[in-house]
Regions:
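Conserved donor-binding/catalytic core segment of Leloir-type glycosyltransferases
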Residues: 221-238, 244-247, 260
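Short hydrophobic beta-strand element within catalytic cores of glycosyltransferases
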Residues: 332-335
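Conserved acidic donor-binding segment of nucleotide-sugar-dependent glycosyltransferases
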Residues: 347-348, 352-359, 368-374
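A short helix/loop element that forms part of the nucleotide-sugar donor recognition site in Leloir-type
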Residues: 208-221, 274
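Aromatic "clamp/platform" in nucleotide-sugar-dependent glycosyltransferases that forms part
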Residues: 315
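Nucleotide-activated donor-binding/catalytic signature segment of Leloir-type glycosyltransferases, i.e.
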Residues: 271-294
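Carbohydrate-associated surface elements
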Residues: 181, 201
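A short, well-ordered alpha-helix in the C-terminal region of glycosyltransferases
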Residues: 361, 368, 375-390, 399-401
């Protein structure tokens, strides 16, 4: 079986959670005898340091554009980097020539509409994975997504109508989401649709290998410091400037604390705000911005392992694949109460949750992990056991492969009752 995976954006230098999830899915599918190819927009970057290519995955590039007049190049770059509704004339022809048995869109809107139209033309199934959510998105995040459009004229509605982009979730053959709350909202809006809660995965054994020395060699400034680590692209929903603003109070209580932010700068105004806040607060020696590190690299794993705590401060986090990585690395996790972490974390057992609107709850969680050695050890041990049992790569990929196979049955479509029968293996929502 061959799968065509469609990405709205793929820049290895801006690697993030979506890319990690897709690569791990593809690697897991390989163990099930399923081959994959990636279809992604053009990139000026070299393929020499491309993790997909390094894993033996063919990456076919298509030309894509944002159909908007009257915006600056910076606004256009931000649209492409984070949430822009792109279109491509190349992608449809590329998919028609593909030998794929299933088309799997890891995007929504026009790009997913093109994938759906190609699948219907080829009479093969089409599925969508919602990596960033569709209905369970806070209003402030929606505002941030549309901010780059301000002052411009969006002329792509006719293109969207051509591929029925607004009906993708209604017309696709199955929707994967990693978020139970999102699944409930989708099932309510599309009661006849197959909505499948499909968690992401982590190669737990890889993250258990001790790489602390590699991290120390790459970043000697961390020696003797108590690290608070976060892995995230530098985009608005990750709420990183807020985290920086909490550091003076943390240092007042824990003088050796250092904040380590691992991730590529995908949104320029967020990068600028981070540097501005670090300078304003005099934290140049207490905040380490590593830039993007390769997924699964010794340096990345080592920094997570060196951390006293792994801290998420996101205002929107549909899943939180980095939580799985921290658990697998044996690091205690604290997180803001967004839908993904709320579904993942058992408060007090596998991590601690706090309210980002109430910073005192964040500091209470930090204090608990720093001061209570017994709790710290308990969180690490419980989370490590949990990730091994529930989120290792092969078992997750097997569930996706089964959905692909089910959709390829005669007539290529199951009834909803048929899908209900397989819910024990695919986590479909009642």
């Amino acid at each position: 079986m061959k799968i065509a995976h469609i990405l709205r954006k793929y820049e290895p230098a801006q690697w993030g959670g979506t890319e990690t999830a897709v690569l791990r899915l593809i690697q897991g599918l390989q163990t099930q005898g399923v081959s994959s190819a990636i279809h992604a927009p053009d990139s000026a970057a070299s393929s020499e340091n491309d993790p997909m290519c390094a894993a033996g995955v063919k990456v076919s590039r298509y030309h894509a554009f944002a159909p908007v007049w009257g915006i600056s190049q910076r606004q256009r770059d931000e649209l492409v980097s984070w949430g822009g509704n792109l279109f491509s004339f190349d992608l449809f022809a590329q998919l028609l020539q593909s030998p794929a048995d299933v088309i799997h869109s890891h995007a929504l809107n026009r790009i997913a509409g093109i994938g759906l139209r190609a699948a219907r033309w080829k009479k093969i199934p089409h599925v969508v994975t919602l990596h960033g959510g569709a209905l369970d998105i806070p209003a402030e995040v929606n505002e941030q997504l549309t901010a780059p459009l301000k002052g411009g004229f969006e002329w792509g509605k006719a293109l969207g109508a051509l591929v029925q982009s607004r009906r993708v979730l209604e017309l696709t053959d199955a929707i994967f989401t990693c978020n139970p709350r999102e699944a409930q909202l989708l099932q309510r809006k599309y009661p006849q649709q197959r909505v499948i809660v499909q968690p992401h995965s982590v190669p737990a054994a890889q993250y258990a290998v001790d790489h602390c020395d590699a991290a120390l060699k790459a970043f000697p400034q961390i020696a003797g410091r108590d690290l608070i680590v976060k892995v995230a692209r530098l985009d608005p929903a990750k709420n990183l400037p807020w985290l920086v603003r909490q550091l003076p109070e943390i240092k007042r209580r824990h003088p050796k604390a250092m904040l380590v932010l691992i991730g590529a700068g995908t949104t320029q105004h967020v990068v600028e705000e981070l540097h501005r806040e670090i300078g304003r607060l005099g934290l140049q020696n207490d905040v380490l911005l590593t830039g993007g590190l390769a997924s699964g690299s010794p340096e990345l794993i080592g920094l997570i392992q060196q951390a006293r705590v792994f801290a998420l401060s996101s205002t929107a986090e549909p899943f939180g694949i980095v939580i799985l990585e921290a658990w697998a690395a044996g690091t205690a996790v604290i997180s803001s109460r967004t839908s993904g972490p709320l579904a993942l974390i058992d408060h007090g057992r596998t991590g601690l949750l706090y309210d980002v609107e109430t910073p005192s709850t964040f500091h209470q969680a930090i204090d608990a992990v720093f001061n209570d050695a017994k709790l710290h050890q308990h969180l690490r041990e419980e989370a490590r056991a949990h990730v091994l049992a529930e989120y290792d790569v092969p078992s997750i990929a097997a569930r996706v492969a089964k959905v692909y196979e089910d959709l390829r049955r005669p007539l290529a479509r199951l009834s909803k009752a048929d899908m209900n029968d397989s819910r024990s293996t695919t986590y479909a929502i009642p």
